Swiss-Prot record:
GO terms for biological process: axon midline choice point recognition; cytoplasmic translational initiation; formation of translation preinitiation complex; response to endoplasmic reticulum stress; translational initiation. The modification Phosphoserine is found at S44, S133. It comes from Drosophila melanogaster. One of its GO terms (cellular component) is eukaryotic translation initiation factor 2 complex. It is found in: Cytoplasm, Cytosol. A zinc finger (C4-type) spans 260-284. This is Eukaryotic translation initiation factor 2 subunit 2. Gene3D superfamilies: 3.30.30.170. The modification Phosphothreonine is found at T145. Component of the eIF2 complex that functions in the early steps of protein synthesis by forming a ternary complex with GTP and initiator tRNA. This complex binds to a 40S ribosomal subunit, followed by mRNA binding to form a 43S pre-initiation complex (43S PIC). Junction of the 60S ribosomal subunit to form the 80S initiation complex is preceded by hydrolysis of the GTP bound to eIF2 and release of an eIF2-GDP binary complex. In order for eIF2 to recycle and catalyze another round of initiation, the GDP bound to eIF2 must exchange with GTP by way of a reaction catalyzed by eIF2B. Keywords: Cytoplasm, Initiation factor, Metal-binding, Phosphoprotein, Protein biosynthesis, Zinc, Zinc-finger. PANTHER family: EUKARYOTIC TRANSLATION INITIATION FACTOR (PTHR23001), EUKARYOTIC TRANSLATION INITIATION FACTOR 2 SUBUNIT 2 (PTHR23001:SF3).
Length: 312
């Protein structure tokens, strides 16, 4: 068979090398390719096997087996390996880089947590400092509103400033309560048929913090009569008067000579300068002059006869 056909095993090797490719699909599908070979190749392979059996050479038999396994040649596989080996190496290196990146990320995350804690502490500290600075600025604004400003203030601003000072000096007014001046009602008694006794005159004068003489002059001038103090410190007034009349006179006296004309505070002092009286307020500090006491109309009854006699 070998002599007739003239097949050489070396030629078979060359033919197989020509048919083999570097493609893995071809390497994996060698079994299918061997099935699709020509019948002449199968016949030559059978002839070669017969010749090998005749020679009974173990070494050549072993070589023939290697020749059959030649499609799985290591040279071809090594030639194909580098194209895939580089990818495999790159693929193997990428997870290492990812692991390194992950480690770096974890470390950075830990640092960020620490930095967040520090940032929170710094934020709280900054907020506390800001609150303190704002409180100080508010205190400075309240204490020195006019400091460091040259502009002209509006009427509303000035009015607001005045009311703020009044509220600072009078905390009772901050709650919407005006200071009320409480005074005892006058005790008026009838003395005979033509005189009236003002029993608690001295007590009212002490309550108003005024001199009894000044109050007496105003009372007699407003009532248009005369009167004097007796031994029991009671005011005896000529004429018949009702308690309501005495109370109205006292109200006018308090409004004019006791309460402040600015803040209506009863905490005032009546001072005399030369011929004028000045009302000094201890609450708001205002100072204003008051009218002098003038005697009103007085009826002349006892002297009319003498006057008429002189004229006639």
């Amino acid at each position: 068979m070998d002599a007739e056909d003239g097949f050489d095993p070396t030629l078979l090797k060359k033919k197989k090398k020509k048919k083999t490719t570097f493609d893995l699909d071809a390497a994996l599908g060698l079994e299918d390719d061997t099935k699709k070979e020509d019948p002449q190749d199968e016949a030559s392979a059978e002839g070669g096997a017969a010749a090998e059996e005749d020679n009974l050479d173990l070494e050549s038999f072993g070589k023939k087996k290697k020749k059959k396994k030649k499609p799985f040649n290591m040279d071809e596989i090594e030639a194909a390996i580098p194209s895939f080996g580089g990818d495999d190496v790159a693929a193997s290196e990428e997870p290492e880089e990812e692991e390194i990146n992950l480690d770096m990320d974890f470390s950075m995350a830990k640092k960020k947590k620490k930095s967040k804690k520090k940032e929170l502490d710094e934020l709280f500290a900054d907020q506390a400092d800001d609150d303190k600075s704002e409180d100080k600025e508010n205190d400075e604004d309240n204490s020195s509103t006019w400091f460091g400003s040259d502009r002209d203030y509006t009427y509303d601003e000035l009015l607001k400033r005045v009311f703020e000072i009044i509220l600072d000096k009078n905390p009772d007014m901050a709650a919407g309560r005006k200071p009320k001046f409480v005074m005892r009602p006058p005790q008026v008694l009838r003395v005979g048929t033509k005189k009236t006794s003002f029993a608690n005159f001295m007590d009212i004068a002490k309550t108003l913090h005024r001199l009894p003489k000044h109050l007496l002059d105003f009372l007699l001038a407003e009532l248009g009569t005369s009167g004097s103090m007796d031994g029991n410190q009671q005011l005896i007034i000529k004429g018949r008067f009702q308690p309501k009349q005495i109370e109205n006179v006292l109200r006018r006296y308090i409004k004019e000579y006791v309460t402040c004309h600015t803040c209506r505070s009863p905490e005032t002092i009546l001072q005399k300068d030369t011929r004028l009286f000045f009302l000094q307020c201890e609450s708001c500090g205002s100072r204003c002059s008051v009218a002098s006491i003038k005697s009103g109309f007085q009826a002349v009854t006892g002297k009319r006869a003498a006057i008429r006699a002189k004229t006639t």
